[in-house]
Amino acid sequence: MNSQPPMLSLPASYCRDHVSPIPSVAVWAETTTGTMIETLFLDQSLAFVEKVDWHGSLVQRDHILPIWRNRYTAISGIDSSGKVDATTGATETHSFALDPYLVAGEAKKFVVCVEINAPSDPDDKWQSAELGQPSLLYTALVKVDTDQRYRTLDLTAYGSPGKGELRYDLETVSSAKRLVDLLLVKLEDGRQEDSSSSE
C-alpha cells in the first residue's frame, strides 16, 4: 500500500438567480487560532494588484475581500498599500503550506475559510453603488482523522471593508446571504493501492 496524505477539495453551488455578475472569491486555510496557513484559491483578477477594475469601478482589494487581505497582511508583513507593515511581526518562519496539516494519525485540524463578495449589490443598509453589501465569510473546522469526509461551511461573519474585522450582526445583510446554495469541504483519503503488492 502506497500511503499518500489526504486530499482536500471544495465543491460549491451558487444560487443561479443571484450570481450575475460573478462574485469575487478567496479560499484559504487557517489554524484554529486564526493564523492563515495557505491561500488555496484567489480570484485571478485580485491576485497581483491592490487596485482592480471591479466590474467597472476601481476598487482596493482590501475593500472587496477584506478578511482575506487582513489575514494575508498578518503573515506576509505587506499591507494593502504594498508597504511592509512593521506591526505584523516576523514572518520568516511561516511555511505558507497546508501539507503538514494533512497528516493522518496526528489529530491534525484546521479551518477552511471562504470569503465571497458580489459587486453592485446595495441595499437599505449598504448603499455604496460600487461595493454594496459586504463580503461574507463561510467557515468549517476540518479534523483530518475523522471518518466524516464532508463538512458544510457555515455562514460565520461579514468583513469590515478595508479593515478585515469580523462582524457578526448578519441580520444587516440581505440578498448577499442568498448567493451561496452550498459550500462543502471534502477530505479524501489519499492512499492508493500499490499495484506491485498484488502481483
Where are these regions (language model features)?
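Short amphipathic, basic-aromatic surface patches that mediate peripheral association
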Residues: 5-22, 45-47, 122
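Intrinsic-disorder/low-complexity, polar/charged segments enriched in Ser/Thr/Lys/Arg/Asp/Glu/Gln
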Residues: 5-9, 93, 111, 137-139
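Short, solvent-exposed aromatic-acidic interface loops
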Residues: 15-16, 39-49, 155-166
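Short beta-strand/loop motifs in extracellular/secreted proteins, especially
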Residues: 23-25, 110
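Beta-strand signatures of extracellular beta-sandwich domains
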Residues: 26-30
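Structured domain cores in non-transmembrane regions
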Residues: 32-122
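Glycine-rich, aromatic-bearing surface loops/beta-hairpins
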Residues: 100-199
